[in-house]
Amino acid sequence: MIQLKTINPDNWRLGLKVRSDQKQFVSDADRILARAFAYRNQRSRAFVIYDDETPIGMALFYDIEDAYNFSQFFIDERYQRKGFGYQAANLILRKMEQDGKYNKVILCYVEGDEAAKQLYLKLGFHHTGDDDDGEIGMEKMLR
């Protein structure tokens, strides 16, 4: 069963990583933690994604002006192509809905990352037309 656990002193150094050909598209675990700290005043929430008790990925979102920014998300190379990304992203979206502060989620993916693009489309995101130096903007309404 997929679950999210807030990053804490016991789970922040788990060695999670993506394939070498994916590194251009996603931040590594240390950078996600640094970003969570940098955005702490915007209520950043960083999670380790678990399949039962096995850590399989990481995610981060935080508040911006009028939306949640689903900033970082990856599944470890050993657990990809098993549907975990879709399940975990749905849990993140539910957390945002439960929080209830905003109705909108924004994110971006790096141009060329077809796996991310397809995942986000499947989750109901649509393109905004924003392109910030190869980062393609998407958004989704929660309610």
Where is each model-derived feature located?
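Conserved beta-strand-loop-alpha-helix junction that forms the acyl-donor binding cleft
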Residues: 106-117, 133-135
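Terminal substrate-recognition subdomain of acyl/acetyltransferases
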Residues: 136-143
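Acetyl-CoA-dependent GNAT
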Residues: 2-71, 76-78, 89, 95, ...
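Conserved GNAT acetyl-CoA-binding A-motif
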Residues: 96-108
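Conserved glycine-rich acetyl-CoA-binding loop
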Residues: 76-90, 99, 111-118
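Conserved active-site tyrosine of GNAT-family acetyltransferases
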Residues: 120, 125
